[in-house]
């Protein structure tokens, strides 16, 4: 849309690795590279967990970085829990002129909360007041 309207802005899109099971994502990836959308940055929350199961029990999406590069994207990988790395990676976009950028942020779902960490069971679970308080306590928050 920006190119057609001759507007100069940068678009950021965030997806989870579980979403990348959908073919429309890969169609969009091919089109973005084909049209040289250097004003597009994709952030992938790569936590290895989809809504219904761990990614490896479904259709594997790894190796993500290699796939995005094969589609013509400039790629960086970071620790998605390191705020400094996140800021540095976002400040550096576009990674290559004339190519869309993919930032793969490796994370652990529910990090720091024992009953939610690294499990799909808390992907869309109900958070009661008690659960909320327990999570805050485990994170060391008041």
Regions found by a protein language model. Give the residues of each.
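Glycine-rich ThDP/TPP pyrophosphate-binding loop and its adjacent helix/strand module
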Residues: 1-142
């Amino acid at each position: 849309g920006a190119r057609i309207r001759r507007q100069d802005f940068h678009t950021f899109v965030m997806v989870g690795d579980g979403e990348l099971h959908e073919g429309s994502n890969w169609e969009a990836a091919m089109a973005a590279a084909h049209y040289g959308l250097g004003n597009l940055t994709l952030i992938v929350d790569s936590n290895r967990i989809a809504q219904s199961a761990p990614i490896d029990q479904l259709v594997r999406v790894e190796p993500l970085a290699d796939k995005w590069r094969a589609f013509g994207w400039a790629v960086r990988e970071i620790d998605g829990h390191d705020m400094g790395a996140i800021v540095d990676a976002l400040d550096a976009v576009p990674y290559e002129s004339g190519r869309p950028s993919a930032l793969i942020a490796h994370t652990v779902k529910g990090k720091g909360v024992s009953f939610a960490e690294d499990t799909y069971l808390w992907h869309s679970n109900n958070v009661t007041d008690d659960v909320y308080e327990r999570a805050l306590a485990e994170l060391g928050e008041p």
